[in-house]
Swiss-Prot record:
The modification N6-(pyridoxal phosphate)lysine is found at residue 226. InterPro entries: Aminotransferase_I/II_large, HisP_aminotrans, HistidinolP_aminotransfase, PyrdxlP-dep_Trfase, PyrdxlP-dep_Trfase_major, PyrdxlP-dep_Trfase_small. This is Histidinol-phosphate aminotransferase. Homodimer. It comes from the Bacteria. Its cofactor is pyridoxal 5'-phosphate. One of its GO terms (biological process) is L-histidine biosynthetic process. Belongs to the class-II pyridoxal-phosphate-dependent aminotransferase family. Histidinol-phosphate aminotransferase subfamily. The lineage of its organism: Bacteria, Pseudomonadati, Campylobacterota, Epsilonproteobacteria, Campylobacterales.
Amino acid sequence: MKFNEFLNNLSNYEPGKDIEVIAKEYGVKEVIKLASNENPFGTPPKAIECLRQNANKAHLYPDDSMIELKSTLAQKYKVQNENIIIGAGSDQVIEFAIHSKLNSKNAFLQAGVTFAMYEIYAKQCGAKCYKTQSITHNLDEFKKLYETHKDEIKLIFLCLPNNPLGECLDASEATEFIKGVNEDCLVVIDAAYNEFASFKDSKKHLEPCELIKEFDNVLYLGTFSKLYGLGGLRIGYGIANANIISAFYKLRAPFNVSNLALKAAVAAMDDDEFTEKTLENNFSQMELYKEFAKKHNIKIIDSYTNFITYFFDEKNSTDLSEKLLKKGIIIRNLKSYGLNAIRITIGTSYENEKFFTEFDKILR
């Protein structure tokens, strides 16, 4: 069977390996997953209780207006319901953005290394990709590329903080850059990890209400998969001016998010004890990863997320990843990004100690 030719130029996104699969494949009893930046404390207790109470409604289609979650988000971010769209993960809203702006005659701009789905979705539209030479968000390079190809570039991605590297621009740096962007070019600020960055440094904090008030061409993305521990329910959102949201709705299928996901997201936003514990654990444990890196002369980039990336000169990241798998520890090998590096999710103290113990042996 023949398929559309553009599929020949697409590669599959490589998600983190599954715990059950690794346990069976490697014959290990205990598996620790530090690969997909999931919440190490699991699902918020209030969300669990909400799911229990609503489990008998799984046969019902969701409220397609999503009014309860939209109103909760609108109150949190001081925006209107018409400024919000809910997606099956923020990935789906990224897809809306790309399909609304890109085609085979234009292009988009991103950092040298950033979230892989931007390029995967854009290639489905035949759009050209411009990347900075620097792997991180070097705004001088962004400006130079944008000015050179201004007529062609219709979409810019700023991943703040950046996945899979962890660095983050100050909010003021991002807004200053956006001022130089044409109003017909959509700037997507992927803030999937911004709660972590804001906790560590208030200068990284992004306010959607201020962004969309100042700029008509900005889309702010948020997710419930990281801080809020709902990755398995697939729910995220976008915040932008009403014209952008209205355009996205023409691409959205009805009932794109389950009723259980919608309910759980509202409950998760009300579980402050859970999110505070998550943030405090993350950055206290992050210090141990920095100490480990220093001890073993491993290069790192200061991370504003719930993960840290280790860069290697002589050791091979694929070999290291395989050896960790044999010990029942799943991390993310970044070879597919062209890096000799691994990304490690910050886990619980027990999970992290297990990683340090086993990785120390591997590095000897």
